[in-house]
Amino acid sequence: MSYYGSSYRIVNVDSKYPGYPPEHAIAEKRRARRRLLHKDGSCNVYFKHIFGEWGSYMVDIFTTLVDTKWRHMFVVFSLSYILSWLIFGSIFWLIALHHGDLLSDPDITPCVDNVHSFTAAFLFSLETQTTIGYGYRCVTEECSVAVLTVILQSILSCIINTFIIGAALAKMATARKRAQTIRFSYFALIGMRDGKLCLMWRIGDFRPNHVVEGTVRAQLLRYSEDSEGRMTMAFKDLKLVNDQIILVTPVTIVHEIDHESPLYALDRKAVAKDNFEILVTFIYTGDSTGTSHQSRSSYVPREILWGHRFHDVLEVKRKYYKVNCLQFEGSVEVYAPFCSAKQLDWKDQQLNNLEKTSPARGSCTSDTNTRRRSFSAVAMVSSCENPEETSLSPQDECKEVPYQKALLTLNRISMESQM
């Protein structure tokens, strides 16, 4: 069966992930819409012409400095020290100029000893704020203004030091670095799990000190345009089987594609054609600091592999459990019908009706019940497995297969498995 067509192309993923052949990722030729959330969790959003932008940043200057980059933070802190030294140095120089200390008259008691130039005043300001205290320059009791200036500079130096140390510690203890050690699988998978189509991705924590507890959440973001050409974004929560996890070992997050899922009516071809993005978040508490962290990632249709399951990463040893991190991204191709979960449920319903109404079932009923899901997934949807066919409705696309033909198909599969 060929999956090549005029409107699809094979996406090459061999360069970065050699374990995935190119034919496993199918995407549309049209230009893909830019994603809202990058793979590293950063938002692809740019705000322009914000009302009161600088005012809002200056009001919450502490948070602004914590969120800024380290090089910008270093420039701000350096300028705060240098400007404070220059300002108070200028004040001491003006005091000395007004009092006549620059004339070096021995009959005049200076306000600040040994300050006869602006350079000397700047050095005295630096020594005062950093509490160096060389002893060569000192303030006298001749001028109360000079004494008051020294007091103000000492208070301001304590404020600046406290502000800088607090911001630096808060920036080093930020949750962003811890969030970088939480890893999401690059691809999400769609495959059969316990007889149902499921969307799966993997989360792993590769630090020795693991998280205490965590909550996983997933949302499907769908882009659409109205009649006037305006783009709208609609968010739909995905119900997860295991949303509360303890991330001691890598965990596979599972979303069952049922009637409440927004992926319920999408088959393999429709997933490749659709324009959506799955946003996944993991909120957790670290056992080292006890603070809350959040890790984010997203999956677009070209990053969803149909008919795959993840490799096992956990090995049970005699005295411990071994996690093979090399298999974290690995997956193996397994059978999965190309039709949607809605079509699978419709075929199951048709099979149940056949079981109730057909009198010729006889003794084969119990044997068929045990393999009902295999019957539905293999025999009944055999006409749906071509992704190039147009998907209109379950009745139009998946035509009913006669019971005798389906039973013959099951018998042939059973005989081939026993050989």
From Swiss-Prot:
| Pfam families the UniProt entry points to | IRK (PF01007), IRK_C (PF17655)
What does the record say about tissue specificity? Expressed in the brain, testis, liver, spleen, kidney, submaxillary gland and adrenals. In the kidney, expressed in the epithelial cells of both proximal and distal convoluted tubules, in the endothelial cells surrounding glomerular capillaries and in the flattened parietal layer of Bowman's capsule.
Motif range (Selectivity filter) = 131-136
Q: Which UniProt keywords apply?
A: Cell membrane, Ion channel, Ion transport, Membrane, Phosphoprotein, Potassium, Potassium transport, Transmembrane, Transmembrane helix, Transport, Voltage-gated channel
Query: Which residues are listed under the site Role in the control of polyamine-mediated channel gating and in the blocking by intracellular magnesium?
Result: 161
According to the record, the segments passing through the membrane are: 68-94, 144-171
Superkingdom as given in the UniProt entry: Eukaryota
The entry's cellular-component GO terms read: basolateral plasma membrane; monoatomic ion channel complex; plasma membrane
Q: What membrane topology term does the record carry?
A: Multi-pass membrane protein
Q: Which reaction does it catalyse?
A: K(+)(in) = K(+)(out)
* Residues recorded as bearing Phosphoserine in the entry: 358, 374, 376
Primary subcellular site in the record, as a coarse category: membrane
Segments on the Extracellular side according to the record's topology features: 95-117, 135-143
Sum up the protein's function in the record's words. Answer: Inward rectifier potassium channels are characterized by a greater tendency to allow potassium to flow into the cell rather than out of it. Their voltage dependence is regulated by the concentration of extracellular potassium; as external potassium is raised, the voltage range of the channel opening shifts to more positive voltages. The inward rectification is mainly due to the blockage of outward current by internal magnesium. KCNJ16 may be involved in the regulation of fluid and pH balance.
Oligomeric and partner information:
It forms heteromeric channels with Kir4.1/KCNJ10; this interaction is required for KCNJ16 localization to the basolateral membrane in kidney cells. As a heteromer with KCNJ10, may interact with MAGI1; this interaction may facilitate KCNJ10/KCNJ16 potassium channel expression at the basolateral membrane in kidney cells. May form heteromers with Kir2.1/KCNJ2. Can form heteromeric channels with Kir4.2/KCNJ15.
Please give the family membership noted in the entry: Belongs to the inward rectifier-type potassium channel (TC 1.A.2.1) family. KCNJ16 subfamily.
Could you identify this protein by its name? Inward rectifier potassium channel 16
What is the protein's species of origin? Rattus norvegicus
- Gene transcribed to yield this protein: Kcnj16
